[in-house]
A protein has these predicted regions:
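Short acidic-hydrophobic, aromatic-tinged amphipathic segments that line or gate anion-handling sites
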Residues: 33-34, 133-139
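Acidic, metal-coordinating helix/loop segments flanking the phosphotransfer/catalytic sites
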Residues: 15, 32-50, 54-63, 67-68, ...
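Hydrophobic/aromatic residues located in beta-strands of well-ordered beta-sheets
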Residues: 8, 30, 108-110
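Short, aromatic/basic amphipathic alpha-helical patches
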Residues: 21-25, 121-130
């Protein structure tokens, strides 16, 4: 009897990661959702072994973004356009917080973001999400597979 393929939930606002991973990193059973709320629903409904999470969500309607637009607007001197961009540019972190707050902090997450110059930021995030991993934009399929294997071990 063969071992089942790991279930990887891709959370992104486009289809790039789904297309790329299914083509170049075969093996896992991939599923995709396009918002944080949908990610939480998918985690509740099925046995997800790993979340592959995008950082930036700039193709999603404002109503589908997690986070407090009023707080983001205040943070950007009352500019609602900058507040909205803040939510878009950091949506992966808002989704990560949402998953942790709803009891899914033990599910390993690969965040598609380059932390190579932000070691302190990554360290801070790992205090809240110990099973947090990352891959940058210029990653090879072999590197993605290695990070997936590490995250699933």
């Amino acid at each position: 009897m063969s071992e089942r393929a790991p279930r990887v939930l891709i959370v992104e606002d486009g289809d790039e990661y789904l297309r790329t991973l299914t083509r170049f990193v075969p093996g896992p059973d991939y599923a995709q959702v396009k918002s944080g709320v949908a990610a939480l629903d998918a985690l509740r409904a099925a046995g997800v072994d790993l979340v592959y999470l995008d950082m930036r969500f700039d193709r999603v309607p404002l109503g589908d973004l997690l986070g407090d637009l009023d707080a983001a607007t205040r943070r950007h001197n009352g500019d609602p356009a900058r507040g909205w961009r803040h939510l878009q540019n950091h949506q992966g972190l808002f989704i990560l917080d949402h998953l942790v707050a709803n009891g899914f902090g033990d599910v390993p997450v690969i965040l598609a973001y380059d932390f190579s110059r932000e070691a302190r930021r990554l360290e801070f995030l790992r205090r809240r999400v110990p099973r947090l991993y990352w891959v940058g934009d210029a990653v090879t399929p072999e590197e993605v597979l290695a990070v997936m294997k590490e995250a699933l071990s």
